Amino acid sequence: MITNDHMSDREDIIKIVEMFFEIGKTKDLSKLKEIQLNDTNFSSFSDVQPYDLKDYKTSIALEELRFVSISDYDYEIKNPKISIFNDSAVLAFELMQKGMLVDNKAYTGEHITIIGRATFVLWKKPTWKIIHIHLSKINK
């Protein structure tokens, strides 16, 4: 049975993850620190290099670089599934990202499209924050 609390939690969770990708459009990088938990438990895997497991500080730096390097950024979240376990939640979905990868030094750009999957783990402390991100490409 889904209670009203679970409905508002679900809405909050999807909004936080959408905010993560909206940063690619708005370039408001300060939001990255608002929606991700600055904690030693934070971790992430990316769909672009480097592929190793990253901590909070490294993740933020690479996310900032990624979002400022892609102009005309857009994304689509498909088939989201949210599972809530008390004060933690998992959001898994299919993800399409596209834009123009810009090389400011060479004044060139390359259109990119990344089809992939994403899993976000969030922790309610006291509001929902991202504690883990796993992005992976699907080679088509």
Where are these regions (language model features)?
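Hydrophobic residues on conserved beta-strands that form the core of alpha/beta folds
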Residues: 77-79, 92, 130
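Short, low-complexity N-terminal intrinsically disordered segments enriched in polar/charged residues
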Residues: 1-35
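Short, cysteine-centered beta-strand-loop-beta hairpins and adjacent loop/turn segments enriched
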Residues: 68-69, 98-111
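A short hydrophobic beta-strand element
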Residues: 86-103
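Short beta-strand edge/turn micro-motifs at domain boundaries
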Residues: 90, 110-140
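A solvent-exposed, acidic/Ser-Thr-rich amphipathic alpha-helical stretch
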Residues: 29-84
